[in-house]
C-alpha cells in the first residue's frame, strides 16, 4: 500500500548527500480519498482501507519533516462524509480518536505544529477537546506545519464565510460597500 500513497518525489529514500539534494515543494495537500475503494478492491472491508490510510498519515508526516517540507495539509473528513452509512461514520470517528491519541507523540518527535480547519462544532466533545489540546500543545513548534481538515468542504466554508460577513455587516463591524 505504501507505493499507492507515496508521491513520486518521495520515492527517493535519502537526500542526505549534497549531490542528492532535490527541490521539494513548500506545501503538500493530500485528500484522503479512495482508501475504502482500495480495500474493497482487495476483498477487505472499507474500514480496513480507512485504517491503512490513517497509518500512512504518520509516515507521510515523518517523511515530509525529514525532507524539509514546511506545510502539509490532510483532508481527512469532508462535510459530505456525514452522508455515509452510520457504521462507517462511527468507524471514521473511532479512527480519528485513535489517531489523535498518538498524534501528540508524532508532533513532539517531528516538532510539528498542528492546526485543524473546518467546522468542528458537530464533532463529539472529546474530539473537540483533543483538537484544542493538540493545537495548544504544538502552537510553538517550528517544524512541519500540519493542518488537518475535519468536517471541511469548500461549499460549506464559503457559506459560513458569507454568513459571517452578513452578520458583521448587520452588526456594523463591516461596511457592505
Locate predicted features.
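Flexible, compositionally biased loop and terminal segments
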Residues: 4-177
